[in-house]
Amino acid sequence: MNKTFEKLGFYPADILLPKDQDMTKWAVVACDQFTSEPEYWQAVEEKVGKAPSTLRLILPEANLKAPNVDEYISGINAAMEQYLKDGVFRTLEDSLIYVERQQSDGRIRHGLIGMVDLDAYDFTPGSGALIRATEGTVLDRIPPRAKVRRHAPIELPHVMLLVDDPDKTVIEPLTAAADTMEKLYDFDLMQNGGHIRGYKLSDKQVDAVAKALEGLA
């Protein structure tokens, strides 16, 4: 791995991707969405059925206060173990993925999937940590999240980092090169979620990202 990443708090990661699955059923929105709309999650449940899905690997915040939340968490950990045992995943070692997510309104959001150094993160207001929160943290949501992770063999984090890059040095070169990159996935998202594509960065592109981020640090 490029040593430059060590001072950035953001790294390439070993990323798990499902093999030979219905990707529309596999991918669901982040657990902190539609918290007051249980009907949305019920529709997702009906869409997924018995297919392998990240729905089985997350705890939607709509269920945080459910009376059977401990049972729900045990089911999540069991599903993780079963998916690993069944060989559901393939591993992209030490990788970054460039993502283009087309929203239902046609707008495209661009991003980069990697790994965040949580030791460099602090959600305390006014913190000077390398990685800081952009909004307030709801403390009572932490315990059930921690409980899911306590026995979890894999991670499904929902962390979004914002980068101030006025000269467009990090993402835009990847957008321009997308047609030449290895495409990892390309599918419609359920529930009118739009469309998503993912591309694996080459070693040269990973090094370029490290250099660009170092220039912004």
Q: What is the predicted function of each stretch?
A:
Residues G128-R132, H195, L213-E214:
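Glycine- and acidic
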Residues D179-D207:
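Glycine-rich phosphate-binding "P-loop"
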Residues M1-D188:
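N-terminal extension/subdomain marker
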Residues R149, K204-A217:
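A sequence-level detector for short glycine-anchored, His/Arg-bearing signature motifs
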